[in-house]
Amino acid sequence: MENTMKFGYEKHNADTIANTDKKRICAYFTVLDTHKIKPVDIRFRTNELLEEVAKHDDWILESVIWDANHKIDTNREGLNTILDKAKNDEFDILLMYHCMQVSRSGSKTFDWTLQLHQLGKSVYGIVDEIHSFDELAEALHLTVARQKQYEALKKA
C-alpha cells in the first residue's frame, strides 16, 4: 500500500507552484510497513525533508510518497505512482530519502531511475547527504550492459 501526502498542495500551494520558476520536489520515503507509520516518524522525516528543501532557494515541495519496503523486490505502488507523476509532469526532482536503491538489484534501480531521467526528471538519493544521479549510478555496481547504457547517457 502506498500513501501520497500533498501537504496542502491543492489548497495552498497550487497557485504558488503554478506561478513560480521553482523546481517541484517529490519526495520518496520507504518504511517497513505503511500500516505501521507512526506520527513521530512522519514528523521527524517531514522536518528533515523540509530542512533539505529549505537549503535550495529554487525548490518547492510538491508531494511526498510513502512506500513499504518489506517486499523489496516486488512491484511497489509508490514507484508506479512516481512514474505516473513524472509522465504527467507533476514534479521536476525526485528525492529518495534514506534509500539509494529501490530494489536489491542495482539493475532494477538503474532502469527505474533511468526512466525518470529520460522523462527529464532529476533524481537524488539522500543518505546522510545528497547524492546525484551519477553518484547513484556509480554506487549500484551495474552490469556491463547497464554500465554501457550509463556511459552513453553521460555522452548524450
Residue ranges with predicted function:
Residues M1-A156:
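Short, structured surface patches at the beginning of a domain
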